[in-house]
Amino acid sequence: MEDVSHMAMRRICKRIAGPGLMFTEFVSAMAIHYGAVKTFRKMRIHPEERPLGIQIFGGEPAVMAETARIAEEMGADIIDINMGCWVPKVCKTGSGAALLKDPDTAEAIVKAVVGAVQKPVTVKLRAGWDYSLFAAPEMAKRFQDAGAQMITLHARFAKQGFEGEANWALIREMREVVRVPLIGNGDVKTPEDAKKMLESTGCDGVMVGRAAIGDPWALARIRAGMMGDPIPEAPSLEERIETARDHARMHVALECDAYEFEEIEKTGADYSEAERRAIRSLRGLLPLYIKGEPGASQVRARITHCDTLGQVENILDGYLCERRALLPVG
């Protein structure tokens, strides 16, 4: 998920939810080809994240193979090829879900990437470009024959975006033709959703995306439900705010090419520009940690004007103090 599943988010999810395969934000192969520093930063991996797949996108087999080799060198456990992004700026380059309209190029990309690396190669795709053709089954067969070791299907068509409900029956149809592990994706928000998807489709696992934005505890609940363990209690307001603080601090560190905020504090170097970039990129995400709480909309409005970590922490701490003051005494 672009600008969401960065290292800070992934580390928080891993700490809260425990074992599970995660993927980076998608990485533009063409940007890597031209040496974009910001894009290289997306491929950095922290040891606590593993296993971790680096997801790449592009429309040229040779450039995709080159990027896959770099991702492997940077420590990826899996190379995942994105053929599901429906956003126009991606599709107009012949990348992402646009490849659903060009199965020959899509297959050539999979072959090129598989031939370029030793790590497993996986593919994430949508059901098809539009309702006129459920393209995924035939394409998945070609991908597995080309060497892909896992397929993830988001059970919507590209033209849908995120509109309507995911059609899990499409995953069941895919199960009939795909012999490699098949992962279902789309509208899994609760433990009950995950179990229903597994039981109704025969898929081998579930991928959760949007449900974890601002609520990484959803992953812990879903995992517990799938494993038959007790469902964890909902986090306290204090825990959610502390997690938002950790998220912000780790993301500032990432923009400074460090793992922990304390590392950059010790150097004494000026990190104000990196801090500004990091905090601005989190303006829409951090308020989601307290979504639904009284006064959350006011907090969101204030954070949208923040440029520094100190400003964010002051707003969150002030909000927590206000909420504590309203609690009954005794």
Regions found by a protein language model. Name each.
Residues 11-17, 65-79, 83-95, 103-180:
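Alpha/beta enzyme core
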Residues 1-77:
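Glycine-rich, positively charged N-terminal anion/phosphate-binding segment
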Residues 39-41, 94-100:
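Short glycine-enriched, charge-decorated loop/helix-capping segments at active-site entrances
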Residues 35-39, 102, 153, 167, ...:
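Short, solvent-exposed helix-helix connector turns and helix-capping sites enriched
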